[in-house]
Curated annotation (Swiss-Prot):
GO terms for molecular function: structural constituent of ribosome. The gene is rplS. One of its GO terms (biological process) is translation. This is Large ribosomal subunit protein bL19. InterPro entries: Ribosomal_bL19 (IPR001857), Ribosomal_bL19_CS (IPR018257), Ribosomal_bL19_sf (IPR038657), Translation_prot_SH3-like_sf (IPR008991). Keywords: Ribonucleoprotein, Ribosomal protein. Pfam families: Ribosomal_L19. HAMAP family: Ribosomal_bL19. This protein is located at the 30S-50S ribosomal subunit interface and may play a role in the structure and function of the aminoacyl-tRNA binding site.
Length: 118
């Protein structure tokens, strides 16, 4: 009974506009930022290193290099603070967690684009 109630409550918190993407894909996350009384959209574009969790607890780790410094952020996928997630390009990788990219720089950190057939 309690699990049925939990699943009903969790289903109301899920978003239906989350695109299909995996680790290795370059994503652009639009985040709502509130500063005082104003609200603006901040974009964070980078490579998705991992997806973990399920349901309303699902999170993604996105990494980008900004002015020579690697920056990683963890975003809750179904958070109301995340305005939208766009897939910029698909990456061809063979792993679900790309933590090895943290030690690479320059051309070594590139991910080959996945070519999808019809």
């Amino acid at each position: 009974m309690a699990t049925d109630l939990m699943s009903v409550v969790e289903a109301t918190q899920l978003r239906d506009d989350v695109p299909d993407f995996d680790s290795g894909d370059t994503v652009n996350v639009h985040l709502r930022v509130v500063e005082g009384e104003k609200e603006r959209i901040q974009q964070f574009e980078g490579v998705c290193l991992s997806r973990r969790g399920s349901g309303p607890n699902e999170t993604i780790t996105v990494r980008k290099v900004s002015e020579g410094v690697g920056v990683e952020r963890i975003f809750p996928v179904h958070s109301p603070r995340v305005a939208q997630i766009d897939v910029v390009r698909r990456g061809a990788v063979n792993r679900s967690k790309l933590s090895y990219l943290r030690g690479l720089s320059g051309k070594d950190a590139r991910i080959q684009e996945q070519i999808r057939g019809n």
